[in-house]
Structures are given as C-alpha cells and as structure tokens.
C-alpha cells in the first residue's frame, strides 16, 4: 500500500514539483514548490482527521495535497488536470481503483470554477491549499506588480495565518 511518505520521496513526483517551482519562479508567480506542497499535504491530512475521515482517507488527502500543483511545470492554465494525469501515470498500478480515482479527482478539482465535491477529500484539499497564505510565497520583487496581482497582494500582506476546523459547523 502506497503511503504519503512514499509519494513524498518518489523521484518523479519530487522532480515535477521542483520543475513547477522553477517554472513559477521564472514567471514571478506565487510559490508552488516543495514548501507549499508539504504544507498543503500536512494540512490536508490534519483537516481530514479533524472532520472524521478515516486514517486511509486522511493519507489519500495528504497525497493529493502533496501532488496537487505538480502539473504547473507543463502549463499554469490546466495544471490541475495535468497533475491528476501525472499522478495516475506514476502510481496508477499501485492503488486500488477507487483510491486512485479519489486522489485524481481531488487534484483535478482543486483549481476549477465549477468544483464538484463528490467526496470530502476534494473539499479537504481545497481548504488546505487555499489556507496556505504567507508572504514567503511571493516571488515577485516589484511592488507595483505585487499590488497588481490578487494572489501576491494577499500573500504579501500576510505574515502569519492559521486554520481552525470546527467539526460541529
């Protein structure tokens, strides 16, 4: 059974994320590298546990969190779809079909306007991803360009952020 630890040390996945970080830095886009993917993976795992998903679902959420942005090195516009397909190409024969589908669906749905959450893992990933707001994610140095980009403005303005999950609500 594949674990989050296995995914985090897979050379293909790590290289895709490194290439994403280089690509996003080259265009002065918000950091989507290993710092971000590790935070999202950890938060997704934690959120899943807090809302009552079982341990394996938490692990799947963490895997989706670690891999969710790795398609950015191919294209920013469709990175979520490419990320899902890349995950399948690397790990397709190592998962039960349903687990693979849940991870792919979460990755594919994390950055689309018409998000369809048919499983809590997808919603968990979006919460984990969007909650990583921090000045360190801003790669742009020109303050006028930072002011012009909504992602950079929000991240630049944030020195610390915390996410609290209220299971009752």
PLM region descriptions:
Residues 13-19:
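Active-site-adjacent bridging/hinge elements
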Residues 20, 24-27, 63, 87:
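General secondary-structure edge motif
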Residues 73, 79, 91, 137-140:
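Ubiquitous "structural anchor" signal
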Residues 82-89, 93, 121:
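Structured all-alpha helical bundle cores of eukaryotic regulatory proteins
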Residues 96-100:
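Membrane-interface starts of transmembrane alpha-helices
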């Amino acid at each position: 059974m594949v674990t989050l630890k296995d995914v985090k040390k897979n050379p293909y996945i790590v290289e895709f994320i490194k290439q994403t970080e280089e690509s996003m830095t080259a265009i002065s886009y918000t950091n989507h590298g290993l710092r971000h993917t590790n935070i999202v993976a950890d938060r997704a795992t934690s959120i899943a546990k807090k809302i009552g998903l079982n341990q394996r679902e938490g692990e799947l959420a963490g895997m989706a969190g670690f891999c969710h942005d790795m398609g950015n090195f191919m294209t920013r516009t469709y990175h979520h779809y490419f990320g899902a397909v890349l995950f399948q190409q690397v790990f397709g024969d190592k998962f039960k079909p349903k687990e693979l589908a849940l991870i792919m669906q979460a990755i594919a749905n994390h950055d689309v306007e018409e998000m369809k959450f048919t499983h809590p893992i997808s919603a968990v990933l979006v919460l984990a991803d969007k909650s990583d707001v921090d000045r360190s994610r801003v790669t742009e140095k020109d303050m006028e360009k930072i002011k012009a980009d909504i992602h950079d403005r929000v991240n630049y303005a944030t020195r610390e952020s915390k996410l609290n999950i209220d299971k009752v609500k």
